[in-house]
């Protein structure tokens, strides 16, 4: 739980972050028994962090560790970047695994936005109808490596730009 503030900040700032937490043994987990806690310092941290992470998983099957690590790394660093969290029970941490039998993660091909042209035209229409348009520019421009394209857009539009506070 001590990492929550940092994770929330990473989520809001689109910063990759990889958190690994320990959990009580699987046998000591409440697993829907209607209790708040059964094991020593047990907390369903995944439920707590789901809304401030791109990916959060309880690794309850030792043979799935490779999958979860690879997926978490992928999610943290692709698309809009952000934090990920893996929670690993003590008995899973101590389990011997056969590296050759570990299941990996294969990302799905990125989907193209088939409505992008329509969306851009709608934005242009809104800008043309606006009495006092302003462009709000955030850190996503820098993260996407689109500084040059953004500068060209600003020059083309000729409207005021407001940037976020750093």
Show which residues each predicted segment covers:
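N-terminal alpha/beta PP-like core and its mobile active-site loop of ThDP/TPP-dependent enzymes
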Residues: 1-166
């Amino acid at each position: 739980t001590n990492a929550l503030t940092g994770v929330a900040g990473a989520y809001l700032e689109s910063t990759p972050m990889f958190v690994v937490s320990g959990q009580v043994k699987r046998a000591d987990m409440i697993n829907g028994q209607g209790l708040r806690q059964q094991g020593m310092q047990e907390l369903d941290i995944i439920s707590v962090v789901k809304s401030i992470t791109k990916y959060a998983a309880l690794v309850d099957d030792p043979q799935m560790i490779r999958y979860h690590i690879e997926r978490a790394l992928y999610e943290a660093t692709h698309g809009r970047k952000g934090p990920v969290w893996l929670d690993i029970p003590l008995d899973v941490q101590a389990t011997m695994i056969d590296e050759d039998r570990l299941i990996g993660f294969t990302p799905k091909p990125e989907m193209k936005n088939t409505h992008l042209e329509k969306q851009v035209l709608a934005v242009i229409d809104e800008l043309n109808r606006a009495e006092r348009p302003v462009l709000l520019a955030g850190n996503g421009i820098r993260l996407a490596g689109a500084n040059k394209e953004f500068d060209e857009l600003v020059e083309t539009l000729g409207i005021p730009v407001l940037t976020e506070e750093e």
